Amino acid sequence: MSLAPIPSDDPKEQLETAEPESGDPKDERVQLATASQRQLIWMRFRRHKMAMIGLWILILMYFVAALAGFFAPFTTNSAHSTHAYHPPQLPKFSISDGFYVHPSEGRTDIDTLKRVFEEDTSEKVELGFFVKGEPYKLFGVIESDRHFFGPKEMGERFYLFGADRAGADVLSKLIYGSQVSLSIGLVGVAISLVLGLILGGISGYFGGWVDNLIQRFIELIMSIPTLPLWLGLAAAIPPTFGIVPTYLMITVILSLLGWTSLARVIRGRLLQTRDEDFVLAARLDGVSTARIIRRHLLPSFMSHIIATVSLSVPAMILAETSLSFLGLGMRAPAISWGVLLQDAQSVKTVATAPWLLIPGIAVVLAVVAYNFVGDGLRDSADPYGKRSE
């Protein structure tokens, strides 16, 4: 009876015994031996199935958000009050007409006093790809009137995800809202990352009274309840502020508390590694303090930084959505997922128009995808971590 080999924690031995994905095992070992740190991280990340799924979901979401005007069937200002709370329409297909839907006319039911829409089966609204529709500016510069999918005739309406109380297309507003909700997480985390790296790096590398001062400041910020502080600062934003100033203010507010955990992680790791031999050798070689931290110390615990940052993005997306949902974040006419969810605050409204909760599904999907990617990056950047299957 043969015994199974005991797995080793040595990263070099893990690379030597790694199973190749395809091709000659010897060529794979040579590739692993000569690969850079980024290449090794990417090789391990590709084996993490859920992380790859999350990555493709995020790529698709950001791609659609970047080209919102093209993918949205209508612009954000396009609304028809007679189509308020129009239910979602499922496209039909025929060989002669292609994709189409039947137009609907709304009326108020006398018995239930509910808004009811009845299809006119004698008429058809033909749908197509790359159709000419309402004009828009791509990236705010390029003028175009082509839409990925929508009615072939100008003026006709089609509601794949239904309509809101103003009669605007929920799908179009969902796509435009992703620009704010998805970008505010990245911008906010970028600000938090810079603050965390600078203050955490100074605190952990120099120590002494500088460390005590920075840590007491961090503890003071962390002792303040997060949600009440966010609510107070967001409520202080004047309602007369424009969309861009409000966006910047909300981003800064969300970043004020996001950097503390990252700074403490960096500080703790620097305290452990600042007296290592390779750091002493760099000092004797005349390397500057900034270069020692950037090139020698930070890469040694990059997995912790990646994990903290990747988990901070969905937290900021949820924070922006919560503030906007409560009316303290982005406000109309600005569009974000939180602003769209304001229409779903009433139980009566949700009961009659459940499709208004679709922006909430988008929030959950983005948060879960970010968590999957964060787990995959953390495991891939840790050479002593267990290889993901």
Give, region by region, the residue ranges found by the protein language model:
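Gly/Trp-centered helix-boundary motif
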Residues: M1-L193, L197, I293, P333-A334, ...
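Alpha-helical transmembrane segments of integral membrane proteins
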Residues: A163-E389
